[in-house]
Regions:
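Short, basic/aromatic-enriched C-terminal tail that caps enzymatic domains
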Residues: 221-235
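Structural signal for interior beta-strand "rungs" in well-ordered beta-sheet cores
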Residues: 2-215, 220-221
């Protein structure tokens, strides 16, 4: 790690690749091997390419990670942390104090809100909107144009760590253009169908069909999303 005159207080690891027109805030740290595309912005205190440090019993322990890749025009906001092995698409925005783990993939034009945590091995599509203080658990899939409201939480372990090494963690699957309200909880392995709507505060314990509106604790389907609310009407 060495200081660089490309930004005030900037530190760069070995073999970092920096594209044209990249802007650095104050006290940014770029770890070894990180690839930063043209026109990216790394704001004050951002840490990118951080190597993961895992507990001895972590399900992710022992796996190698590739360098972090930031696509052209991606923005890493103030004090965000992005691990090595993640891939951030062109024009994506990672909000202040957000946290993106190794092997996470975030598609072009997506937003990860302030303080949101995206765990390891998560796949987020293009143009997704993940709001403030969301927890996206490991092995979740969030498809294109999904909206997740503030404080929503996904989970992936029914046993809460009372399992052997052969146990497969199961994150949530959020299909294209579905919407999840603020404070909703999605239990391990649930799938929310295309254009479905999960009300704020719902606890989703089973799959929700495409275009269904579900609410309550536990969540129950109460009606169907109307034609006027489909994404194509709001492009």
């Amino acid at each position: 790690m060495r200081p660089s005159d490309l930004g005030p207080g900037l530190f760069l690891g070995d073999d970092v690749q920096i594209g044209e027109g990249v802007r650095f805030g104050v006290h940014v740290v770029v770890h070894a091997g990180t690839v930063i595309g043209d026109g990216c912005e790394l704001q004050d205190g951002a840490i990118v390419g951080k190597p993961p440090k895992l507990a001895r019993h972590s399900a992710a322990a022992g796996r190698t990670v590739a360098p972090l890749e930031l696509g052209a025009g991606a923005v890493v906001c103030a004090r965000a942390i992005v691990f090595a092995g993640a891939r951030i698409g062109a024009g994506a925005i990672l909000g202040d104090q957000s946290y993106v783990r190794e092997r996470a993939v975030i598609g072009a034009g997506s937003l990860v809100g302030r303080g949101t945590a995206v765990d390891n091995d998560v796949v987020i599509g293009e143009r997704a909107r993940i709001q403030t203080d969301v927890y996206v658990t490991a092995f979740s899939v969030i498809e294109d144009d999904v909206f997740v409201g503030p404080g929503a939480c996904t989970t992936n372990d029914d046993t809460m760590s009372r399992h052997g090494p052969e146990y497969a963690l199961r994150g949530a699957t959020l299909r294209r253009a579905c919407r999840v309200g603020g404070g909703a909880v999605l239990c391990p392995g649930v799938e929310v169908g295309e254009e479905a709507f999960i009300a704020a505060g719902a606890v989703v314990t089973r799959d929700v069909p495409a275009r269904a509106v579900a609410m309550g604790v536990p969540a129950r389907v109460v009606r169907e999303v109307g034609e006027a609310d489909l994404l194509e009407r709001w492009r």
